[in-house]
């Protein structure tokens, strides 16, 4: 029986997920606003704006008609930036059949409300099943069919299991969980920590400082996860520790690259805004609300606000009172 996977969003990640679905033998539909992108994908098997050096699988069908893309879909992957998710699904959500679970593929916290993506979408589409896909995965790797493992989360266990089975393919392995908020928390907060890791390398502090920031940053992530009722195994898993390791160590990460540029003192005005920039102040406020010690996240927020320099941030972190390791 043929299965259909619909992808909303013609950027790098949306294109990669559509390619993954096609390689898995599914009927893969991709919605993009740009007509030229749609023509190029259908005719040349390439997205001229993203991943242009990768030939895409033949099974992808791109369209500017969102209704045609989502009709009859066994799953709808919403690959919309976190800060645009509310508007995007307010516009497109009414087209999505209620029987089709919506899989959120953006990692972030809404800036104005402090809500996770699943909470935002639940307000807009309260009658739909909502899931999230997260884990250590770069779009170029997935589009090329390189081995990748991620987590699919939905509060309904049967839906989580079905989605994991549906989305898993020859080189794309999905683990299922019902810990939706835990998966989203790890995916959002690792972006902030990646900026810190990139800034340390960009400033020339070296790999030892990078390792310390990532490790102590993970301790902050665990504390926040506990306050958010995330399961420990979720934070220790692919969507937590796994994603943190990848994002904090590769220039393919937009957040890490942003931190690198920040550390080098480069002009950031023309650089695409990393999701961690929007998440940092929200994460810092979340920690204050729950009385969580998160000095690295606090430092990133202050750094991005221009309140301190990188050198001042590192000095302050090193001069904190000594304590036992947690």
UniProtKB/Swiss-Prot annotation:
Catalytic activity line of the entry: sn-glycerol 3-phosphate + NAD(+) = dihydroxyacetone phosphate + NADH + H(+); sn-glycerol 3-phosphate + NADP(+) = dihydroxyacetone phosphate + NADPH + H(+)
Entry coiled-coil feature ranges: none
Keyword list, A-Z: Cytoplasm, Lipid biosynthesis, Lipid metabolism, NAD, NADP, Nucleotide-binding, Oxidoreductase, Phospholipid biosynthesis, Phospholipid metabolism
Cysteine disulfide partners in this protein: none
InterPro entries hit by this protein: 6-PGluconate_DH-like_C_sf, 6PGD_dom2, G3P_DH_NAD-dep, G3P_DH_NAD-dep_C, G3P_DH_NAD-dep_N, NAD(P)-bd_dom_sf
Residues where NADPH binds: 13, 33, 107, 139, 254, 273, 275
Binding site for sn-glycerol 3-phosphate: 107, 135, 137, 190, 243, 253-255
Keyword field contains Nucleus: no
Annotated catalytic residues: 190
Listed HAMAP family: NAD_Glyc3P_dehydrog
Record-stated family: Belongs to the NAD-dependent glycerol-3-phosphate dehydrogenase family.
Protein name: Glycerol-3-phosphate dehydrogenase [NAD(P)+]
């Amino acid at each position: 029986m043929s299965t259909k996977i619909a992808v909303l969003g013609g950027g790098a990640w949306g294109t990669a997920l559509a390619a993954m679905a096609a390689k898995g033998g599914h009927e893969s539909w991709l919605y993009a606003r740009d007509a030229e992108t749609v023509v190029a994908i259908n005719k040349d098997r390439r997205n001229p704006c993203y991943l242009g050096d990768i030939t895409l699988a033949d099974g992808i069908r791109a369209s500017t008609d969102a209704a045609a893309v989502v009709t009859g879909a066994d799953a709808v992957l919403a690959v919309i930036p976190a800060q645009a998710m509310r508007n995007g699904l307010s516009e497109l959500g009414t087209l999505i059949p209620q029987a089709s679970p919506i899989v959120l593929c953006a990692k972030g916290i809404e800036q104005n409300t402090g809500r996770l993506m699943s909470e935002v979408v639940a307000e807009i589409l309260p009658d739909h099943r909502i899931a999230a896909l997260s884990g250590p995965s770069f779009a170029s790797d997935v589009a090329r069919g390189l081995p990748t493992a991620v987590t699919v989360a939905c509060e309904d266990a049967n839906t989580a299991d079905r989605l994991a089975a549906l989305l898993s393919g020859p080189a794309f392995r999905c683990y299922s969980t019902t810990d939706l908020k835990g998966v989203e928390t790890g995916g959002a907060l690792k972006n902030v920590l990646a900026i810190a890791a990139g800034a340390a390398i960009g400033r020339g502090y070296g790999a030892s400082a990078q390792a310390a920031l990532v490790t102590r940053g993970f301790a902050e992530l665990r504390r926040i996860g506990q306050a958010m009722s995330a399961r420990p195994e979720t934070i220790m898993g692919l969507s937590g520790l796994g994603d943190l390791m990848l994002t904090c160590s590769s220039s393919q990460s937009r957040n890490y690259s942003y931190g690198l540029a920040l550390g080098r003192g480069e002009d950031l005005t023309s650089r695409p805004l990393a999701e961690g920039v929007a998440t940092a102040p929200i994460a810092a406020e979340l920690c204050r609300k729950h009385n969580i010690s998160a000095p690295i996240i606090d430092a990133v927020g202050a750094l991005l606000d221009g309140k301190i320099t990188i050198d001042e941030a590192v000095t302050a972190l090193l001069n904190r009172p000594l304590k036992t390791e947690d």
